[in-house]
Design a protein with these regions (language model features):
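Solvent-exposed, charged helical/coil patches
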Residues: 1-3
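N-terminal positioning helix adjacent to the helix-turn-helix/winged-helix DNA-binding module
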Residues: 8, 12, 40-41
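Helix-turn-helix DNA-binding elements, focusing on the entry/boundary residues of the two helices
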Residues: 13, 55-57
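Short, Lys/Arg-enriched anionic-surface-contact patches
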Residues: 18-41, 66
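Ser/Thr-centric signal marking residues that sit
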Residues: 28, 52, 70
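Short, amphipathic alpha-helical "recognition" segments used to contact nucleic acids or chromatin
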Residues: 38-54
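Short, basic interhelical loop/turn and adjoining N-cap
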Residues: 57, 61-74
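Intrinsically disordered, low-complexity basic tails/linkers immediately adjacent to helix-turn-helix/homeobox/MYB/SANT
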Residues: 66, 77-129
Length: 129
């Protein structure tokens, strides 16, 4: 992983910790199962897999104690949640807006998410799960 990608991961950790009100160490260690920590971990795993191209069997380098099967489960579960729960989709779009502008711009171009959904998000409000 080059320096740019390392910085992307650090920014993502910071944004996730602010969004889900937890410490970076709480979601990078497989110790707690509180809802906000699990959701923060799920965001981080999905971001690493989808946008940083980290393989499932290498997730253990970023989240201590992570098994590849757990990583696969979290990615599939997160995709299902984005499809069924609009608040999770809004949080994901908000996360990309603050963490990675390149991916946010790609998301706006991608036809999977309508522009109306992206434009109607109030980025100043706090989304609470």
């Amino acid at each position: 992983m080059n320096q740019y990608e390392k910085e992307k991961v650090e920014i993502a950790k910071f944004v996730i910790s602010k969004m889900w009100d937890c410490n970076e160490s709480q979601f990078t260690l497989m110790k707690k199962r509180n809802t906000n920590i699990v959701m923060a971990r799920r965001f981080f795993i999905y971001y690493l897999w989808k946008h940083c191209e980290v393989k499932h069997n290498r997730m253990k380098d970023y989240i201590h104690g992570m098994n590849h099967a757990t990583s696969i489960y979290h990615c599939r579960k997160f995709e299902q949640e984005m499809e069924f729960y609009k608040d999770i989709l809004k949080k994901w779009i908000t996360f990309l807006y603050y963490a990675d502008q390149r991916e946010y711009q790609k998301l706006k171009i991608d036809m999977k998410y309508p522009i109306e959904t992206i434009n109607n998000i109030d980025f100043n409000s706090n989304y609470i799960y």
